[in-house]
């Protein structure tokens, strides 16, 4: 399967866990791989891969899963849905390559990468056992949820790009649907990942 990716860690013996990272619009898998390097030492038996978006973003080295040009609350879900089969296929490709099942797979995303990770579990329940969504949101809130996947929402309290209210609404929707979810708010943080965000993520994994 041909897609942009950067292998952060590949264990010598068969992998016991699979950690897949997904970047934001205009970023690339190598840059997001730096986030993966925080997880790798704590999970020496994990295959850790940073996956690039499916299409170029206009920025020379940047990738994206869907365009944000002219995006609205009304058309966001359709854009996510259009590329979702490719996203799910990518996750399944790495599960097959690693020999790791969904029960030991974690999807870790920032911004648009977090949107895709969250939406993938909505589209394909049980695709992974954990999602860590840094400064993400749902395109539209889930009406059903499964405890087969634990969702960890980590969000900057001062995010000007994806308002904290989206994470709060996601938590409330998942709880109402009977899902397994946590929300950690990083005070005074904008649309970014910092050491505090990472510590929340590491504590959950």
For each predicted feature, which ranges?
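Serine-hydrolase catalytic machinery in alpha/beta-hydrolase-like enzymes
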Residues: 2-104
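Alpha/beta-hydrolase fold active-site loops
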Residues: 17, 149-150
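Short beta-strand/loop motif that positions the catalytic acidic residue
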Residues: 152-159
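A conserved short beta-strand
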Residues: 126-138
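Active-site signature of alpha/beta-hydrolase-fold catalytic machinery across serine-
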Residues: 34, 119-123
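Gly/Ala-rich beta-loop-alpha elbow adjacent to hydrolase catalytic centers
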Residues: 108-113, 117
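Conserved alpha/beta-hydrolase "acid-adjacent" motif
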Residues: 30-31, 160-166
